[in-house]
Swiss-Prot record:
Sorted UniProt keywords: Disulfide bond, Fimbrium, Lectin, Signal, Virulence
Lineage of producing organism: Bacteria, Pseudomonadati, Pseudomonadota, Gammaproteobacteria, Enterobacterales
Name of encoding gene: f17dG
Compartments (UniProt record): Fimbrium
Residues involved in a carbohydrate binding: A65, N66, D110, T111, S139, T140, Q141, G142
GO cellular component: pilus
Organism of this sequence: Escherichia coli
Listed name of the protein: F17d-G fimbrial adhesin
A biological-process GO annotation: adhesion of symbiont to host
Signal peptide: 1-22
Domain of life: Bacteria
Function: Essential fimbrial adhesion factor that mediates binding to N-acetylglucosamine-containing receptors in the host intestinal microvilli, leading to colonization of the intestinal tissue, and diarrhea or septicemia. Also confers adhesiveness to laminin and basement membranes.
A Gene Ontology molecular function term of the record: carbohydrate binding
Comp. bias (Polar residues): 299-308
Disulfide linkage: C75-C132
Length: 344
């Protein structure tokens, strides 16, 4: 009788110990590859439509529903961190640099791609607030990473190759009294190598690149008051564009490149004083302002020349004398403005 009791007690203790096992275990891989290997993606876009996002869907990613096994009321969330350098932003989301020409938008989160958090910066951030498994049930916790390439720089059509690159990590975050103990909590991700076949569209200038506008001779009496204007000359700019290109332009004051007003600085060869030059486009009643010599989208004082439906756009420019209010002294008037096109 005594021996039977000892055997029964030993079995009871064994069953008790099995019940008290940890409520979380790691069943995934510590190193994971994101996207097909190798990947190849092709897109066409206007030359200056930058940064240009390669919308490839969800196929550049990694998702796994079974990374941690959890049970017994265990509560778990996820944190994510990106290790790549931040080189810009788009709609509040960081653009991470891969090469000088190619960057990434990155999302991290729960198993489902659609619930991923848009990543910003290089610190750990909450990418899945979490949940608690039932006290008498078991389940798994997964994760996902999705990336989208971004073209960063103005270039002609090109093929970009990106080597395998470490992206960052996701870690399991126990909460509400749950503890992971010695269980693996962090997994790492690397982006598989890929190529971008990038085709850009643009325009060709049909007008000579240097345009001389002869200014009409006038008398000071035609500009009696400050702000008075008289048409001095006119010219046109014509282009031939690929389909779908929207043309924007910036005029830059060549004599004073920092000038952001609507009056062109006269060159040192001018002898007249108290007079300036304004430039108008088409039938606009507001003069164009001068900006930096740059094709970057959103450049200061950039203005729209055409829409994406025009393949042979043109613009008529009118140059007007303007009384600057400093007292007019007759003489010669010369001004130089450059124009920079942006193909968006």
């Amino acid at each position: 009788m005594t021996n039977f009791y000892k055997v029964f007690l030993a079995v009871f203790i064994l069953v008790c110990c099995n019940i008290s096992q940890a409520a979380v275990s790691f069943i995934g891989s510590t190193e994971n590859d994101v996207g097909p290997s190798p990947g190849s993606y092709s897109r066409t876009h206007a030359m200056d439509n930058l940064p240009f996002v390669y919308n490839t869907g969800n196929n550049i990613g990694y998702q796994n529903a079974n990374v941690w096994r959890i049970s017994k009321g265990f509560c778990v969330g996820l944190d994510g961190k990106v290790d790549l350098p931040v080189v810009g932003s788009l709609d509040g989301q960081s653009i991470y640099g891969l090469t000088e020409e190619v960057g990434l938008l990155i999302w991290m989160g729960d198993t489902n791609y659609s619930r991923g958090t848009a990543m910003s910066g290089n610190s750990w951030e909450n990418v899945f607030s979490g949940w608690c498994v039932g006290a008498n049930t078991a389940s798994t916790q997964g994760l996902s990473v999705r990336v989208t390439p971004v073209i960063l720089k103005r270039n002609s059509s090109a093929r970009y190759s990106v080597q395998k690159t470490s992206i960052g990590s996701i870690r399991m975050r126990p909460y509400n009294g749950s503890s992971a103990g010695s269980v693996q909590t962090t997994v790492n991700f690397s982006l598989n190598p890929f190529t971008l076949n990038d085709t850009v569209t643009s325009c060709r200038l049909l007008t000579p690149s240097a345009v001389n506008v002869s200014l009409a001779a006038i008398s000071a009496g035609q500009l009696p008051s400050s702000g008075d204007e008289v048409v001095a000359g006119t010219t046109s700019l014509k282009l031939q564009c690929d389909a779908g290109v929207t043309v924007w332009a910036t005029l830059t004051d060549a004599t004073t490149p920092s000038n952001r007003s609507d009056i062109l600085t006269l060159t040192g060869a001018s002898t007249a004083t108290g007079v300036g030059l304004r430039i108008y486009k088409n039938t606009d009643s507001t003069p164009l302002k001068f900006g930096p010599d740059s094709p970057v989208k959103g450049n200061e004082n950039q203005w729209q020349l055409s829409t994406g439906t025009e393949t042979s756009p043109s613009v008529r420019l009118y140059v007007k004398y303007v009384n600057t209010g400093e007292g007019i002294n007759p003489g010669t008037v010369n001004g130089i403005s450059t124009f920079t096109f942006s193909y968006q």
